[in-house]
Amino acid sequence: GVRIFENTPVLDVAPDGDGMLTTCASANIRSDKILMATNAFRGLLPQIRRQVIPVWDYQIATEPLTPEQLDSINWGKNRHALSNEAYMFHYYRMTKDNRITWGGGGAVCYYYGSRTDQGVADDRGRFERLSKEFFETFPQLQGVRFSHRWSGIIASSTRFRMVPGIAFAGRVS
């Protein structure tokens, strides 16, 4: 089984016999392996600091789709989140009220040295590019309007995908 420790600031990780010891402010956790889910600006391990960068990412959400529109994309029966590697990567999911949230793609912006620029938060051109990529994936939804848009800094691997087993002989990912 797996145990998840949310909102647990980690002070240190170190090998401990055949496993790992995670030192936290209020407790120590022993485990076989560690999966670290961290923010873009965290970097406890040098191996992870070199693999994770902050990128400015953009998302849009459609207006609620009709049953006919859902049938046209054959996505109305399940609500699985999806991703693809077109234009670097996209990720998208269906919401409870039948909207598609769509993010990523060529609209991702990185500044060398982990710097950021608040001036790109509401870049109209990046949102337009994201909507163009949406309709290239879902041409049958041409004409659907976007009701929401937002952006923010997220953590991404330098390869734009999960990087497993990067420290302590594969015991930390």
Residue positions per predicted region:
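A conserved beta-strand/loop element that lines the FAD pocket in flavoprotein oxidoreductases
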Residues: 1-12
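Ligand-binding pocket scaffold of soluble enzyme catalytic domains
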Residues: 6, 172-173
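Active-site substrate-recognition segment that forms the wall
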Residues: 10-20, 28-67, 72-171
